[in-house]
Amino acid sequence: HYCPSCGERVFTYGAEGHGRTEIRCGYCGLPLEMTESVRPAGSGCVVVVDDDRFFLTLLTDLLTQEGLAAEVLSCESGASFLTQLTQRFRREQPVRLAILDIVMSPLDGVAAALALRALERGFDRGEAIPILFFSAAKATEALRTAMGRCAPAYYLNKGSDATPERLAARMRELFGRVFAGGGAARRPA
């Protein structure tokens, strides 16, 4: 099976969920066989966080050009992300998705994601913003554990052969899977 998150052929496993057995990626856990394909409408704000300006610009442009987001907020650090999110929460402005690079300094993507969940609790937001971790590294067990703690959370490998066209196709497919249920998920209790 090909995993759009990892950007390569992967080993898979079966998982019981939603009343059926799903085939999932053995690296990142993304369901690979879905019953419907959804192309999400470009609504809401997507926040992109990456300390590499090339990828920050690439993702911002792809989200806009592919119609996956009506508004894109770009942040060059985890600290900037948390500041921008706090301001949006105070103004009660929604965020549809947060895309976080994992390897950033001094505040990495996982720490920023955990801080996001704390902010959501502090602002008493009923819905958790889906998080998409974006990295050149393969999904490790530590990342899968962090994704569980930050749920709903997903993973997209930057890919070594990621042309803008290939990355756009993988992002469209992943967005369809993330938003197939209609958007943000309830924050775990």
Which residues does each PLM region occupy?
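Short amphipathic alpha-helix used as the core "switch/output" element in two-component signaling
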Residues: 110-126
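Non-catalytic signal-transmission and effector/linker regions of two-component phosphorelay proteins
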Residues: 1-45, 60, 66, 124-127, ...
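Active-site residues of response regulator receiver
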Residues: 96, 101-105
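The feature encodes the CheY-like receiver
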Residues: 105-108, 139
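Conserved acidic segment of CheY-like receiver
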Residues: 3, 43-55, 59-63, 98, ...
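Helix N-cap/capping motif at the beta->alpha junctions
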Residues: 74-87, 109
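As written
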Residues: 145-156
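Hydrophobic/aromatic residues positioned on beta-strands within the core alpha/beta folds
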Residues: 134-135, 158
